[in-house]
Amino acid sequence: MAKRKIVKKKVVKKNIAKGIVYISATFNNTMVTVTDEMGNAIAWSSAGGLGFKGSKKSTPYAAQQAVEDALNKAKEHGIKEVGIKVQGPGSGRETAVKSVGAMEGIKVTFLKDITPLAHNGCRPPKRRRV
């Protein structure tokens, strides 16, 4: 029987200069997505996807690594300018924003907080007792 060839899917390099970095910082994880101005995803990364497990996913260091990974992937597509949209109350929030600003070759144009706030909607979960 003939062996089947495994064909790898080629990554198409897009030439995009401006983009938006969405940072979703929850209490358990930090997700980073880099999109173009229309909202089409170019690159993404998360603390859990980088090998951080359990409570280590929610650390600021894990958030920094996730941002650096996503932006390095996005740089291959020609990203030079980004805006930042931050969502959530997680501990990796501030570190993630700082590490975007510290990335070499990437200029930050704006910073916006898009955390959803309830106007007396659903009842929140009860307080934890430890």
UniProtKB/Swiss-Prot annotation:
Q: Which Gene3D superfamilies does the protein's record reference?
A: Ribosomal protein S11
Keyword match Metal-binding: no
Q: Does the keyword Ribonucleoprotein belong to this entry?
A: yes
Q: List keywords of the entry alphabetically.
A: Ribonucleoprotein, Ribosomal protein, RNA-binding, rRNA-binding
Which sequence ranges form a coiled-coil region, renumbered to this chain? Answer: none
Identify the Pfam families for this entry: Ribosomal_S11 (PF00411)
Q: What's one GO BP annotation on this UniProt entry?
A: translation
SUPFAM superfamilies, sorted: Translational machinery components
GO molecular function annotations of the record: rRNA binding; structural constituent of ribosome
Tell me which GO cellular component terms the UniProt record holds.
ribonucleoprotein complex; ribosome
* Family statement: Belongs to the universal ribosomal protein uS11 family.
- What HAMAP family has UniProt attached to this entry? Ribosomal_uS11 (MF_01310)
Assembly, in brief, is: Part of the 30S ribosomal subunit. Interacts with proteins S7 and S18. Binds to IF-3.
Q: What does this protein do?
A: Located on the platform of the 30S subunit, it bridges several disparate RNA helices of the 16S rRNA. Forms part of the Shine-Dalgarno cleft in the 70S ribosome.
Q: What is this protein called?
A: Small ribosomal subunit protein uS11
Native organism is: Campylobacter jejuni subsp. jejuni serotype O:2 (strain ATCC 700819 / NCTC 11168)
Q: What is the lineage of its organism?
A: Bacteria, Pseudomonadati, Campylobacterota, Epsilonproteobacteria, Campylobacterales
